[in-house]
Amino acid sequence: MAKAKFERTKPHCNIGTIGHVDHGKTSLTAAITKVLAETGGATFTAYDQIDKAPEEKARGITISTAHVEYETQNRHYAHVDCPGHADYVKNMITGAAQMDGAILVVSAADGPMPQTREHILLARQVGVPALVVFLNKCDMVDDPELLELVEMEVRELLSKYDFPGDDIPIVKGSALAALENSDAKLGHDAILELMRQVDAYIPQPERPIDQPFLMPVEDVFSISGRGTVVTGRVERGILKVGDEIEIVGIRDTQKTTCTGVEMFRKLLDQGQAGDNIGALLRGTKREDVERGQVLCKPGSVKPHTKFKAEAYILTKEEGGRHTPFFTNYRPQFYFRTTDVTGVVHLPEGTEMVMPGDNIAMEVHLIVPIAMEEKLRFAIREGGRTVGAGVVAAIIE
């Protein structure tokens, strides 16, 4: 069969499968591609192809992730599936594979298990906006009351971690039945129902171009007779010539006006998300701006020094620390384009953090950085990455 060409006209959404080991995340991923392949919305990808996921590097950390793509009536999806639990932790914290939503896979035969809990907590901490549940292996449970019990347990667990447990769609089925064509109701039909729920329940993410303008400062030049040019890659939004913008982070926030946008030495009337541009700033001196600050739409982002974070600390095999660290550890936190020193405060009852751990912690930076929830950072010691993290909540 000829490979169907993907039409890029549908809105795009990034999702992934999460849940406890052996509850059927990878089987479900394969089953989705199998069922959607019937309507030309996917190319069937077998279990073993997904399971031997290639290694990738994100922020200096090696992660194994499998990527498949498929489409439904409404959307085009990029779907990530990780072979091991550690890969999920790293993936979600580094944002290597950004998730606009996730399918939580729970085995009906086992109910929620330790990693079910941990993945829900991680999804909450790193800001995954919405979850849909697939209750897998329902063909192994004969008692409908038992299924209801597991469903109640899952809903309670979701509510405990501040997801709307009562409203989240839970689809009952069997990924294996779909792969083996054994039971149409629990297999094929359940997968289609799952995708209908994912389409309906996971909100369409706002495209970067529609969000308020932000550009991390990479370099600053002064051009005689023209003023100061700041270069960088536009992270989101649009910058038009004549726009008023703020310079945020490290020092007091300054206001300025963009009097020119250039790309590849040509003058443009605007730069947008994804563009590498130089922005000419009116009346701003070369020494007023530095790498590590951001240009942004006025009022859209504030500078902060204290925040709660979820972080993963590299093992020594991954090039990380060889020894644990304690409260008052002072590494550098690399945000966007620069390192800022910060002090780590561990939660009550956590004596120390070992290489390979993931941990919730509080950080106090010595200078403010433009930040918001979900912002990713690296933890470094003398330029060497020893961890990765994400801002879970801002304190001040």
From Swiss-Prot:
Gene3D superfamilies: P-loop containing nucleotide triphosphate hydrolases (3.40.50.300), Translation factors (2.40.30.10)
Domain annotation tr-type G: ranges: 10-206
Region feature G1, mapped onto this chain: 19-26
Residues annotated for Mg(2+) binding in this entry: T26
G5: annotated span: 174-176
EC number assigned by the record: 3.6.5.3
Subcellular location: Cytoplasm
Region listing for G4, in residue ranges: 136-139
Region (G2): 60-64
Coiled coil region boundaries: none
Region of interest (G3), residue spans: 81-84
Keywords for this protein: Cytoplasm, Elongation factor, GTP-binding, Hydrolase, Magnesium, Metal-binding, Nucleotide-binding, Protein biosynthesis
List of residues binding GTP: 19-26, 81-85, 136-139
Catalytic activity: GTP + H2O = GDP + phosphate + H(+)
Role, per record: GTP hydrolase that promotes the GTP-dependent binding of aminoacyl-tRNA to the A-site of ribosomes during protein biosynthesis.
UniProt record similarity statement: Belongs to the TRAFAC class translation factor GTPase superfamily. Classic translation factor GTPase family. EF-Tu/EF-1A subfamily.
Protein name per UniProt: Elongation factor Tu
Organism this protein belongs to: Rhodopseudomonas palustris (strain ATCC BAA-98 / CGA009)
